[in-house]
């Protein structure tokens, strides 16, 4: 039975917050302030809070009281959802009060709140195409990211004309909490951050709005300072997996080409997800002099990964620091490995921490950001022949075996499927050679098979992408060169 939209939304706000029935008129006027009184007589069949919020926005657009640009609607939508979101002080008090007796419950409650108030965009994330496919490195995870809407040309034009602002300094800064937003900076009225201490300094814990995996979290420094991989990084990651049980924690590398998209603010990512790299076995055990108590091995993975395990955090940090320092200064001309050129460093590490079976675990992924005439985008970066699938930097998430592929592939891959079935002769030029190869390999392909064939090929290409990003190749020569670096570490003081 249809009910009044505003009244139903207000009822849901009261049920999901500390507002009471006496606050109904006040809340109704809050809603009118945001979306206009022109929505007063609209009816709804829904009782789901986020659906009701979306209906209010659309009614406001129709009435002319809400702008047509998605960015304008997001600003108002976040304010509507802020009505059910406790103040930051309450969020933090509730989190740490619960944490004292049940850390897992404290985390679960904060995650539930972040979904309930639409900060984590559950409906948008559900639009992503996601699947697993077998490769010689195990099952890789493929996602075509459709959750983040592409910019409307009108929004791009409006952003160009917007008054310049450097507040907040970036999208990770603490000052985003409760920030209204603008045409070129996301709405954050319903954003909340849990504060915690590391090294007697304030850090923030939040969820990623457009999550790439389960409980995708961000842990960021309270001050706007650039990313830097150092001994402190290893200690912080191991502290995070201790403080937030069940979560892994990792850092993007701190150099261009091999780093993430935000290098200007010190932050780490984590969450409750088992990535393909985590379940990959050890290709060859190695040992480090003076660290017989630390289990170590080269991981069977397309990228160059050393895995360290110990019950003692301090020992892991000490060995990881030694490996980092050695890698930063290590060159091997025959292997194509160069520590620096013209004073510019090329070497860093992408580190990932976990706590498993009573032990701490560190995966150290060796990175090299050299470029050359042949590979101007990066020698250890997706090469030209696979850039039709993935040309962006290989950051932390891809390193671990989860491909984040661009939205364009949704339609482009459908065109490739049609081409293989003989139902279309048009594919994007960047895919033509690949489509012809698939057609030659599968001359009698059926409609029942075609999606799986294309998806499997995409996964195989992603495995190749990771091989390109790997400093040491996965053949016997590459393994010998990798072990030569291990020997170098053992010779170092």
From Swiss-Prot:
Keywords: Carbohydrate metabolism, Cytoplasm, Galactose metabolism, Nucleotidyltransferase, Transferase. It catalyses: alpha-D-galactose 1-phosphate + UDP-alpha-D-glucose = alpha-D-glucose 1-phosphate + UDP-alpha-D-galactose. It comes from Streptococcus thermophilus. Belongs to the galactose-1-phosphate uridylyltransferase type 2 family. Changing residue 480 to D: In strain: SMQ-301. The keyword Cytoplasm applies. PROSITE patterns: GAL_P_UDP_TRANSF_II (PS01163). Pathway: Carbohydrate metabolism; galactose metabolism. InterPro entries: GalP_uridyl_Trfase_II, GalP_uridyl_Trfase_II_CS, GalP_Utransf_C, GalP_Utransf_N. Its EC number is 2.7.7.12. GO terms for molecular function: UDP-glucose:hexose-1-phosphate uridylyltransferase activity. The keyword Ribosomal protein does not apply. It is found in: Cytoplasm. One of its GO terms (biological process) is galactose metabolic process. It comes from the Bacteria. This is Galactose-1-phosphate uridylyltransferase. GO terms for cellular component: cytoplasm. It holds the Pfam family GalP_UDP_transf.
